[in-house]
Design a protein with these regions (language model features):
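DUTPase catalytic domain/fold
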Residues: 1-160
Length: 160
């Protein structure tokens, strides 16, 4: 869609699949225990035309609707759109960097730091990709057999 092309970025749309933490009775989540993390996350798909409501202080994983392929000589950054930020909704917590060679849908780490619940719709433009040219192509890009590229070709939100 030509409307997604901005002067220095490409707008990305929200996908329809989300993962949220279940309310649990546990004192902590162990990031080394993949089964532990999976057990405490709940997946949902939002039907077309309906909204995903993110409440204040809530966190959710989602993906972009777009499947991207980053060439070996580019790096990309995910930035939230100002329209989301002005509602108190962030699109990434720490993982705003997309490696050269990455292929897949980009996982968004959505947080509502505002005071009101916010409706998010699949297909809505929520973030943008900003590309930067590297001086030389990556020697071992994301997806290279020598790398542990666990999110390569992901289609759904992936937890840690």
């Amino acid at each position: 869609d030509e409307q997604q092309i901005q002067p220095s970025s490409v707008d990305m749309r929200l996908g329809d699949e989300f993962k949220v933490f279940k309310v649990i009775r546990k004192t902590y989540i162990d990031p080394k225990d993949e089964e532990d993390i999976a057990e405490y996350m709940e997946s949902s798909t939002v039907p077309e035309g309906e909204a995903f409501i993110i409440h204040p202080n809530e966190f959710a994983l989602a993906t972009t609707q777009e499947y991207v392929k980053v060439p070996d000589d580019l790096v990309a950054r995910v930035e939230g759109r100002s329209s989301m930020g002005r509602l108190g909704v962030t699109m990434h917590v720490t993982a705003g960097y997309v490696d050269p060679g990455f292929e897949g849908r980009i996982t968004l780490e959505i947080s509502n730091i505002g005071a009101m619940p916010v409706a998010l719709y699949p297909g809505q433009r929520v973030c943008q990709l900003v590309f930067e040219t590297m001086t030389t192509p990556a020697e071992l890009p994301y997806g290279h057999p020598k790398r542990n590229s666990k999110y390569m070709k992901q289609l759904k939100p992936e937890s840690s």
